[in-house]
Amino acid sequence: MKHPLFTSLALVTALTASAYAQTITPTRVGPVSQYGQLMTGKNSQGKGQIYGSCEGVKDGAEVQVRGMSLYWSLMPEAMEFWTEEGITTMVNDMNIQIVRAAMATKASDDWKGEWNGIQLKGWEGDKTNQTNFVKTVVEAAIKNDIYVIIDWHSHSAHEQTNSAKEFFTEMAKQYGQYDNVIFEVYNEPQQIQWSAVKNYANEVIAAIRQYSDNLVLVGNPSWDQNPSDAIGNEVTDSKKNTAYTLHYYANSHCWQGSYGWGDGNNDACEGTKGEKAMNAGLSVFISEWGTGNSDGGGTPDQSRNQSWQEYANKHKLSWANWSASMIKEGTAAFQSGSSKTSLQYTTSGNLVKGYLSTNPKSYTACKANVPESSSSVVAIPFFQNNDRFNVSFANGKLALESTASGTTKIEVFDLLGHTRMQKEDVFASGSHMIDISTLPAGRYLARVRQGVNVRQLRFEVR
């Protein structure tokens, strides 16, 4: 007889990883254990924000995480930190909550750099090594229980649609069931139309959604300075979990008001356009920002940096600082002579480390309220999203208790991320039982959605 049995939280967290990768278990309780999967939503005023699946979409539960962006994976002065030791050192010494893996993409991305005997070229010129660089960072982030952005670091991704789909399909298949992972499908579009970005993003997001409902980040025209371009013309996302990026460099860009050029929306400050997008209900994410000039140079202006930090904190905007590298640029965080186990900070690095010092020093794992039951069917409710409905197991069936009627989608996934059962229907309020006795022995993830409300449980059938 098959019995879904209770398993430990550490185990079930790891079970949703794809079988393509070794099971990865966190070595500590960090921000991912506390907040869960990052997800978009609106507050009671209709403002777009980022939330965590543990508390769900509600006022006061907005999530802001802050950390570092690795430099483009083309320079040996950067690759020292594309390592497990490099990520762990930044967690311990800088208190980062998130890291961004800015992967070079084009075959023509070749700056003649060499690291550990590898000629550094973009993904289209060296799929194996670039993919492995990203995997190393992702797995280090999971072990450290921090978030990780997988960044297709391109200025012309709309010309690389098939390559991006291939890459993100592999990443979603392998890591898409880890709450740590965020997919950034287009780093910085240049001066092209939003429609070109949107059409590209629609295709890549669809590829990701075959295997993962994790947060997706989408860039926008003029180097991610126009998230408001997407208002009323958002990308298509079956999981409704896409945010729009805002990039800024403190010496060059302004956080409020306008430049005074008298050119309509093009005149508005980058921060103003970000706020406009949020007020229209779009979630915004600062996946890259620098302390200096927009070209990466310059000495950080302390006052302008402080104003931008106040802007980000006011709007609960998550960010990754450019860059965790020893590149000879004013925005590089580390001095020459630093290593993956020992960091010596530049002016920029010390400034950013100061901001990161206010991140929490400890975290509490999301509560797993395991109900007492004489039934052999018991599992952990992993996503504590709201009080509108509850999900449990009883007598070989999934039990749904709902206080409201509405369209409800029930999905059960195996370890590969394949859908093993799916049901979508309009359920009235009250109790409903869904038979799962046909599932073979194995480990599964059950997810139940009513609109933006989510419950998720991980269980094992023996």
Label for each model-derived stretch:
Residues 1-9:
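Bacterial N-terminal signal peptides that target proteins for export
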Residues 379-462:
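C-terminal outer-membrane/trafficking sorting elements
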Residues 82-155, 163-166, 208-209, 301-315:
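Aromatic-lined substrate-binding rim segments of carbohydrate-active enzymes
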Residues 17-21:
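Sec/Tat signal peptide C-region and signal peptidase I cleavage site
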Residues 27-48, 67, 72, 79, ...:
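Extracellular glycoside hydrolase catalytic/binding regions
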Residues 22-27, 359-386:
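Low-complexity, Pro/Thr/Ser/Gly/Ala-rich linker/spacer regions in secreted
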Residues 24-114:
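N-terminal structural segment of carbohydrate-active enzymes
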Residues 8-16:
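Bacterial N-terminal signal peptides
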